[in-house]
Amino acid sequence: MKFLVDAHLPRGLCGLFKAAGHEARHMLDLPAKNLTTDNAINLLSAKEKLVVISKDTDFYYSHLLRQQPYKLILVRTRNIGISELQKLFAKNLPAIEKALRKHSVVELDRSELRIVI
């Protein structure tokens, strides 16, 4: 799988996905960096079949209306430390991989991973 980590999440998440054999980029790796628009992210996601990882619910509504981004992990943890967030993703990575094989939107909070669409 290929992942794109949104600007409001730590770059370190990319390392976690790469260590598991996936491709991963952070918004800071894109040409416009943090100035990349949501629309540009959606188009890139659709073109390259990227799973967007974000706290931004605008991506959820965009997916409902236009099926963009291609796939989405919606992070619903509120304020969480970087280390705790990385542990949460590491713990849930097998379930995330399995869910995204069949579904297009999953939601991750501190207690569970939910399939949304």
Name what the model sees in each region.
Residues 19, 90-91, 95:
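Ribonuclease/tRNase effector modules and their secretory precursors
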Residues 27, 62, 116:
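Residues that scaffold the ATP/ADP-binding catalytic core of kinase and kinase-like folds
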Residues 95-117:
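Charged phosphate-binding loop/patch that engages nucleotide di/tri-phosphates or the phosphate backbone
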Residues 25, 53, 73-75, 106:
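Hydrophobic/aromatic beta-strand patches that form the interior of the parallel beta-sheet core
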Residues 45-63:
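Acidic, metal-binding active-site segment of PIN/NYN-like and related structure-specific nucleases
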Residues 60-89:
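Mid-chain, well-packed structural core segment of small domains
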Residues 2-51:
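N-terminal first-folded block
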